[in-house]
Each structure stands twice: as C-alpha cells, then as structure tokens.
C-alpha cells in the first residue's frame, strides 16, 4: 500500500520522520502551506523539507510565514526552513515584527535576521542570548554565531559595545570561542556575566595566578569557585576561603541551623545571579548532620498519634500535589483534611494554620516549628528557580519547596 503524508503523520505525536524526509518534496511543501491541514502535520512537513524546498513553492511558503493569522508553530518551522532567503529580510526588519505577539515568533524572527547576516540585530540577539530560558538563549546564540561567522566576532562586538551586561556576556562567549582568555570577565560587576566567564575557564594555573591579584572580592570568589570546579580540591578551596576571611552573605534572622540546611541544598546549584559567596560557602562549610527521612517521618507520626490527632500515612509533596517534587512530606490529620509539612532538609515542620496542638506535639518530639516570622525571612542574593521566577525566596519556600 502506497504511503501518504496522512499515513506518515496520522496524529499529533505520531510522525514517521524518516518516511517524511524521503517523501516527495513538492507534496510536502503543498501540505505545509495548506491551512486546512492540522498544524502539527504542516509543521512535520516543513521540518522534513530541510535542504530540498521546491523553488516554485517558496512564494506560498513565505506568504504563510508572513500571515499573522496562521499558526505560530507552522510559521516558526517555515521560517527556520527558509532562513537563508534574502527576500525575507525587509519583512523581518520591519517594525511591525515587534508587534507580532504569537508565541515564539519574535525569537524566530531575530534568529532568522542573524542567519541572514543582519548586523543591526546583534543587540536584540545579545538580549535574547542573555535570557534565562534555554530555548531563547540558544536562538540568540545561534543568531550571534551566524553573524560572527560572516563578519568576524570583532565586528559583532563593535556593533554591541559593552554598556549592557548582555553585550558583555556575548563578548565573553564570542571571545572564548575565538580562543581568547576571558579570565578578566570574572571581575564584571554583573554576576551573570562573571558566572558565564567562570564556566568557560579551564586553566587551573592561570586561575591561581589571577586569584592572587584579582581586583575585587567577588572576582576572587569566582576564581576560587572556577578553580574548585576544575580541581575538585575541597581542602585547597577551604584553605583559600579561610585566607579570604570566610566572606558570606549575612541575612538578618537566619540562624546557623537554617543557613546550613539552605546553603547545602541550593548554594552550588543556584541561578546565575546568585552571589558567589553562597556557592563557596556551600563548598567550604560542613553540611547538616545526616539523617534518616523515614525515621523522621516515623517520629512525626508517633508524636501526632500520641497527641490524638489521628495522622494519615505521609506522602511526598509531589504525590500530595499530584505532580512534581520538592523538599517535604505531607501528613494529613483530623476529620477536616488538615495537613502538616515535614521538611527533608532538617528537623523542620510547619502547617498553614499554625495549629497549636500539632506544633506542641512535634516540638516535643524534637522538631523545629517554622512560624510566620521565621518563614518570611528572605534569603537575599540566593537565586532559586520557582515557577518561572529566579529571585531570592523566603525560608518557608526553601525548606518546603515544591515545583511541578
């Protein structure tokens, strides 16, 4: 039985990619431009056309790209397919493109401008390449790489200047890929730029030399962190940390027990703009004593049972929320569906209602109750991803963290 496009792509998520790549290019182009077809089939056809677009179909495919009423997924796929067509450039550069609110279209337009050699897009591409979302960042980087390949990285950097952090971040990346040393960028005042620079560094001896004369405390800490990443030398890192005076971010109200639990859970893996003092503290300080989560839950259950609160079996926060994961377990109790939360990061417990009976029972069993006053302390300069945000969080959210 002869294959058809419909049989090769019968429904969303079920596409014979290799079969479409071997299919007649003219038929694929016709399907990709056919608004009567499902968008996912049209996109699959566009993707299967890579490197073999029939010239006679190009005007119709371009018309689909330029149709703001068409499905953005299809437009983006077609734009990627035809990103080498210079006749698209005037449309791509038109100010109206900035008003196109279709999801992903603005990024795709910028990427195409980079692919077509539009040096005036360098600034917007640098902004995109500085975005915390990986797919946007990669689009920006690909566009900048295309410009650098065409004009040389010096021309791209000259177009950008260095006033904005995103321009300097692009400079770090392009200079590194051109074989230049970017150790000097560890002293950049923007932590995201300095963080990117340390990721690129691979010469431990050069870092040791830089560390001795780094111009700022943060530059020294970035150098120390990069050196630790390269050598995994915990003892040496701790020795240098002591020599620097054990610098750390002071947070009013954050005691040592809370601090240790938080820094050792989040410090090394925090977001780019996190103060490097948190990262180094996570490496150089002792973690909280090891504990058995199962034993802790058993102790909580026993305390709640002894208090006559009729606790139900504990579940993970992911199970309680029916998705995701995090740093606490949930114990339901009583007839009204009340819940108490037991952190996996230490002996911390809390609930939404500050139930005095629950608090009394758990405190008598050695737990530490996190009330509103303590829970609301914001841990400054420690960026942790949380439902799209990367800003510092409060103690309650960090100890009882859940992400879907």
Can you say where each PLM-predicted feature lies in the sequence?
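Short, extreme N-terminal segment that most often corresponds to the first beta-strand
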Residues: 2-11, 282-286, 399-404
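Amphipathic alpha-helical scaffolding segments comprising HEAT/armadillo-like alpha-solenoid repeats
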Residues: 2-5, 21-33, 54-66, 84-97, ...
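Acidic, proline/glycine-rich low-complexity IDRs
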Residues: 135, 368-404
